[in-house]
Amino acid sequence: MEFDVTIEIPKGSRNKYEVDHETGRIRLDRRLFTSTAYPTDYGFVENTLGEDGDPLDALVILDEPTFPGCLIRCRAIGMFRMTDEAGGDDKLLCVPSTDPRVEHLRDIHHVSEFDRLEIQHFFEVYKDLEPGKSVEGADWVGRTEAEAEIERSYKRFKDQGGH
């Protein structure tokens, strides 16, 4: 399964950018309150709706960071199940579908334990100093469950009147 991911935040950034879905422009939401930086490029899957009412979040493993607004054709290799103050907030873990350097990454167990722990740690602490915000990490699931969530998110989007 391949899909498009729109990047909002490049790897290494402490700025949290979001696409304004009404104007199509990129807005600086905030600088992270903690001293952590995004461990991968971060964005969303086009034409989806996650459990939190926003497009489904996606992390993209790349050697070099891209830029806000960059569109990348991806495939999922797993998903980090988590919740925040608004409810379910799952994060897909993806790789560019045309990059031969990541061809060996086909499922979550192909990602090193340390890399998974680094991503998990980021999401467990990145909101720590923000008033009224909270995060609860859960666990990693594999490609099959990630792809099932993508399908559910496409359906939620369509059921809400998306095209």
Curated annotation (Swiss-Prot):
GO molecular function: inorganic diphosphate phosphatase activity; magnesium ion binding
UniProt keyword Metal-binding present: yes
Enzyme category, top tier: hydrolase
Residues the entry annotates as binding substrate: K16, R30, Y42, Y126
GO terms for cellular component: cytosol
Location, primary (coarse class): cytoplasm
Pfam family, one: Pyrophosphatase
Keywords: Cytoplasm, Hydrolase, Magnesium, Metal-binding
Subcellular localization: Cytoplasm
Entry binding sites for Mg(2+) 1: D52, D57, D89
EC assignment: 3.6.1.1
Catalytic residues (positions): D89 (proton acceptor)
Function, in words: Catalyzes the hydrolysis of inorganic pyrophosphate (PPi) forming two phosphate ions.
Protein name: Inorganic pyrophosphatase
Species for this entry: Streptomyces coelicolor (strain ATCC BAA-471 / A3(2) / M145)
